[in-house]
Amino acid sequence: MKRVVKFLMVVVAFAAAFSCAEPDLHPNPYLDVTANNIKGVWRMQSYDNGVQLAEGSYYYIVFDRAERSFVSYDNLGSMGQHTKSGKFDIVTDGAAVIFGDYDFGLGVNDWEHRYYVRNLTKDSMVWVAVDDEELVTVYVRDELPEWIEKRQ
């Protein structure tokens, strides 16, 4: 009888040890959309659903998690650099949506669109305008070039 009990205990222990679920071989590569996960420097890689920036053009946005603020640097639409700052927020009621406003010193202006943030990884993210799903912008993680910092 003791032999049978020991045998059953070994079988149960063996089953418990080897019946665990298999590890997920294809884990979700995407991060939760939070201020912590988007903090840092991002460079616009493409806009309007795949249009690349013209040679010499740039758009960088730097997110500060603690202050929920941003500073953007670009030379789009003009010869010189534009530096804009403001506040942002993220809501995650179903889909993650980022929105914000610019502080121009004369008052606050909302961003032109609110954006779904999709496919956020440590290296890239995709923004899709809530009111125009054809307006797709891809950002990649980067560093702010020194020459931009000097022109602030």
List the predicted regions and their residue ranges.
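Lipid interaction determinants
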Residues: A21-S85, D93-Q152
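Bacterial N-terminal signal peptides that target proteins for export
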Residues: M1-L8
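Short beta-strand-centered aromatic/proline hotspots
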Residues: F88
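C-terminal motif of bacterial Sec signal peptides marking the signal peptidase cleavage site
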Residues: A16-S19
